Amino acid sequence: MAGPAPWNTNGKTCLMAGSGKFGEPGPYKVARKDVDLGMIQANQNSGMFTIFYPNPLEASCLHPIVAWGNGTGVNGADTYAFFNTNAASWGMVVIAAHESNTGTGAHHKKGIDYLIAQNDDPMSMFYKKLAVTRVGTSGHSQGAAGALAGAGHPSVSVNVGVGGPSTTDAKHAGLCLTGTEDIASTSCPAAPDRAKGPAFAASWQGGDHVSTETVAGYITKDAGTLAMQRLYAAWFRCFLADDAVACNLFKGATPNDCGVCKEKMMWAVLKGANIP
């Protein structure tokens, strides 16, 4: 199996021009498809996945892959659908596990392997439509830990943790998203300080780990939602699709000079390192 592509290289990844406002719907319409991948681990509740994908899929370019994992106790694909629908509207094909125990990374890896196989299957709607060396993992809480474990898949080069850890090694571009009241991801703001590869940390003022509206207080449907899903989509768009506009949100002449760093929003922490 081919290894992950280096960051910011010229490739045939889909880069349909959009507004550049990554918290808002991108240039692609989005459809959903459910698949049952059966038994993946002993303590699982579900083998179901939902695929969020651009509709129609491009014929002349390849769509990057993202695998998502839910937080503890969250079943199905609807709780975090706004995150993954938005990413798909910006060109990603996101496969989201319905499972609530995703911390091992097994569901992330299974989802990635499924889409890679679909890319090789002449009978599949995804046949020759996917950038199988442009792959990312993501998740919330326990799912973020699973995304970190799932980043061990040989095709993965990008990782996003929401309310949980993200990668800091030299092989992956890692983004962690958290809130100032989130006691479950207190290490996130300092992640870029120990990163050997591209890394960025963003902490929303007043954001917590859980709330009554959705599982993550800082991804409720308010300004925090748009801010978080904006960086989520932009990170993948930057490192999986070579989008210079997206990359400029995270980089600058100094750590405090990045595009999003200059904005007057409710961010308590915005910090990057090694952004190419």
Residue ranges and their predicted role:
Residues 3-61:
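N-terminal cap/lid segment of alpha/beta-hydrolase-fold proteins
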Residues 56-62, 106-145:
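Gly/Ser-rich "nucleophile elbow"/oxyanion-hole loop immediately N-terminal to the catalytic nucleophile
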Residues 61-71:
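Short beta-strand element of the alpha/beta-hydrolase
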Residues 77-96:
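Short amphipathic alpha-helix adjacent to the substrate-entry channel of hydrolases
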Residues 154-165, 172:
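A conserved short beta-strand
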Residues 170-234, 238-240:
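Active-site-adjacent alpha-helix of alpha/beta-hydrolase-fold enzymes
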Residues 222-247, 263-276:
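Catalytic active-site module of serine/aspartate enzymes centered on a nucleophile-bearing elbow/loop
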